[in-house]
């Protein structure tokens, strides 16, 4: 009877292990994010509302992206590696009374943003503190 229970337990453990392996193989690489379009950049901005979302991740800009007419808002906080790969983000339009304006509002100390071109307009009012095309407040490496 005990042998039978041990076999059942072993079988359950093996099935559980196989399920975990299949699930891990089906998921994309969670440490890489690829940006192909304005919609992808908008989604990145929404995801980066949580300050730890981008930490340990590398974001690749795989195409030139035109933000004209999109509902893009600056990426709130970024804590990973942003590889522009020589591509351009165009049509960046920022305006308002806020400070900390740029494609990224805050770049964390552990972050790097590189090989990126940006074109657009910034029309800021208020205190005009910490405003730039790439980042409003930078603690990382640009």
Question: At which residue positions do the language-model features occur?
Answer:
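Bacterial N-terminal signal peptides that target proteins for export
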Residues: 2-13
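Surface-exposed repetitive/solenoidal architectures
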Residues: 27-142
């Amino acid at each position: 009877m005990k042998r039978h229970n041990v076999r059942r337990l072993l079988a359950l453990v093996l099935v559980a292990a196989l399920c975990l392996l299949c699930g891990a193989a089906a998921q994309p690489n969670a440490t890489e994010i690829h940006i192909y379009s304005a919609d992808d950049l908008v989604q990145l901005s929404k995801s980066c509302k949580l300050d730890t979302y981008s930490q340990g991740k590398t974001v690749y800009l795989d195409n030139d992206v035109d933000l004209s007419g999109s509902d893009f808002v600056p990426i709130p906080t970024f804590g990973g590696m942003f590889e522009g790969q020589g591509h351009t983000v165009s049509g960046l339009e920022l305006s308002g009374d806020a400070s900390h304006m740029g494609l990224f509002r805050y770049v964390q100390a552990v972050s790097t943003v590189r090989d990126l071109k940006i074109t657009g307009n910034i029309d800021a009012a208020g205190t005009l503190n910490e405003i730039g095309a790439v980042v409003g407040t930078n603690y990382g490496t640009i």
